[in-house]
């Protein structure tokens, strides 16, 4: 059997002669090195995104003023306040949580999150980054967490990542 690029006999099971086999191997190794460098660059970029999202989330969280509420004891199962009952002022509004959903979980960014143990699998598909990861010292204010999640989801969409914010009242 002859080489694909010349009339020399092939080397072993290769489709190239010894000279062209070495040349093809060098090209392949160079391609692998370029891919490795691109992957490392992409991973550094993802880490920078996490830092940026953390800063954006904290800024949005602090800039949001939740609607305060007053909680009071009721007379039985009605909305009528209990006479001489206790009442509490809640400056942070309703309690709840917020998170970012990234779909599909097979995207490069989602795989990087999985590898770095950031977030968890979403029940309905995709990958979740909870706001408590990006803002570790946050309160249970749902309005503040929602604001931070929306800001981070927009940042990811600007980076061409399919992401959206979700929340739940506690």
Task: Give the positions of each predicted feature.
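Short Cys/His-rich zinc-binding micro-motifs
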Residues: 1-11
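Cysteine-rich micro-motifs
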Residues: 12-23
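Contiguous alpha-helical segments
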Residues: 22-32
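N-terminal leader/targeting segments
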Residues: 30-115, 123
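Acidic, low-complexity, intrinsically disordered interaction modules
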Residues: 122-132
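Short, compact, well-ordered microdomains
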Residues: 130-170
